[in-house]
Amino acid sequence: MVWLLLIVAGALHALSFAPDPLPDWTLAYVQVLSMAVPAFVVFSTRHIGRAALAAFVFSASSFCVGIYWLYISMNHFGGLAAPLAALAVFLFALYLSLYAALAGACTAWLGRDMNVMRVPLAVGRPLLWACAWTLGEWLRGFVFTGFPWNNIGYAHASSLLSAWAPIFGVYGVAFLAALASGLTACIVYYVKHNRTGIMAAMASALMGMFIVSLALSRIVWYDNQGPPLTVRLVQGNIAQQMKFDPSQLMSSLQTQFGLATRPAADAQRAPSVIVFPETILPTFQDRMAPEFWQSVVDLADQMKATLFLGTPMHTVDDGKDRYTNSVIAINANTSVQALMQAQLPVYDKRHLVPFGEFVPFGFRWFVDALNIPLGDFDRGQQGQKNFAVNGQQFAPNICYEDVFGEELLPSLHTQADGAPGASVLFNVSNLGWFGNTWTLRQHLQISRMRSMETARPMIRATNTGSTAAIDAEGRVLAQLPTATANILDVQVQGTQGLTLYARVGNGLIVLISLLGLGVGWIQKRRSRRTKPVRS
C-alpha cells in the first residue's frame, strides 16, 4: 500500500511543474504535499535501504510522468519502435531517480539516531532532507553533462518561495520546497504520535518560512536600463518534417519572414529587434547563396530593425572546420561577405544536447537507431559577447541552455572588452520535436525562474511555443498560444544591477547544504557516543 501511495504521489508531483492541466496557483501546494509522502516514509523508518527505495519510487513515478514527452521525439519523429522508446524513457527516469534515492538514504542514515521527540532536534530530519535533496538536484544538474529539468524549485515560480531565487537561485528554492515538504510530513508524524507541542513547533517553522519569504518578495533587485524597446518575437509553427526537408526550405523561410514583416499594430512602436526561433535556417550559412543573405539584410533594412536569427554556422579555425548551433545578429549594415564568413555578431551554443548535438561515448548505436537529423556540433567558447542594440545588451541562449542557470551568469557581468553586462536575456528554441506537450509549458516556467534569479527580462522566440515575454520579476507579460503561427510585439524594459545569486551562483546554497549534512554527521557521532551500553 505504501509503494502504491508513493507511485500516485510521484505522478501528482509531475503535474506541479507547469500550469497544464492544473492552474498555476495550485502548483506549489501540489509539489509540497506530494513530496511530503516520501518524506514521511523516510522519517518513519530506520532502514536506509527502505528510505532510499521510497525516494526512488516516488521520483521515478514523477519523472516517468513528467518527461513523457521524450517518447514523442524518439517514436513519432525518430522512428524508434514504441516499446523501445517507452523503455528508453523509463530507464532514463530510473537514472534520474538515483539522486533522490541518494537523498533518502542520506537522510535516513544521518537522522535515524536523532531524538526527534525533542523540539530542537525534531527539525533535524526536515533539514537533513532539504540538504540532501538539494545536493541531489545539484548533482543531477551537471553529472554526465546534466539534466536539471523538473527541479522541484520550478514548481514554485509563482509561489512566495520564489522570492529566494535572487539570493540562492533555483537550488535555494528547491531547498525550501524540500524543507516545506519535510515539515509537512513531520506535522502528520507528530499528530499521529499525539505530540501536539512538537507539531505546533513544526507548523510555526513552516509559517515562519513563508512570512520571511513574503518580506523578501518586497525587495527590488534591479534598476531600469535605458528606455524600453519594442521587440517582435516570431513563432513560425513549422512542422518538423517540413523544417528539415530541403524541398520545403524556402517555403518555411517565406512563412517566417512573412510573419516578421507584418505591420506593427502601433506605428509609433515599430519593433527595433525581431527574434526568430532556433534553426530557422536548418543548414549552414555558407550553403546559402549570397542573394539569399542579401534579401535578409534588405528585410532588416525594410523593418529598420536588428534581426536575431538562429542558424547553424560553419567556420574554419586554424585549418579545422567548426560547426556550431548559433544565433546571429543582422542589421541593414551587415556585409553579406562577412556574414558568409561568420564575421558578424554571433553566439555559439555552449551547452550541447546529448544525442541531439553530440553523441555521448558508447551510444552511437542508439543514435543510429533514430531517424532524426542529428548534428555533431562544436561547443561555443566562453566569454562570448552580448548583442548591443539601442543601448541594451542582449544575452542569447539556445534551446535548453537556460535550464543551466549558473551558466548564464557571466553574461551579466562587465565584458572583457569593457562592454556592460546583459540587460535582457533571450532564448531561441525549437521544441517541435516534442509536440504540443507539457515540455513547452515546463520550459516557460524554467525561463521565469531565470528572470527571477538574474533580475533580467527574458524573451523567448520558439518554433511551436511557448513564445513569451517575461519581466525582471518573472511575470509573464504576454505569450502566444502554442502550436500556432503568429508574432508577439512586446515592450521590453532592460535592467541593470546584480542579485546575490548573480554574484555567487550555486556555490552558497551548495555550501549550506554540505554544512547541514556535516552538522548532521557530527550529531550522529555524538548520539552514538552517548548511547548507554547494554550489559
Where are these regions (language model features)?
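A generic fold-level signal
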Residues: D24, F144, G226, K320-R322, ...
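CN hydrolase (nitrilase-like) catalytic-core segments centered on the catalytic cysteine
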Residues: F92, L96, L281, M288-L309, ...
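Non-cytosolic juxtamembrane linkers/loops
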Residues: A205-Q268, G432-H443, R448-R460, G465-V504
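Membrane-embedded alpha-helical bundles of multi-pass enzymes
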Residues: M1-V220, Q254, V428, G435-T437, ...
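Active-site catalytic loop in hydrolytic enzyme cores
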Residues: I72-L87, M114, G141-P166, D321-G405, ...
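Alpha-helix termini
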Residues: R112-V119, A264-R269, N333-L339, T414-A419
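Conserved hydrophobic/aromatic beta-strand scaffold that supports enzyme active sites
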Residues: A14-F17, A105, L233, V327-A329, ...
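Soluble catalytic regions of membrane-associated enzymes that act on cell-envelope
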Residues: L214-F358, R379, Q384-G391, P396-D402, ...
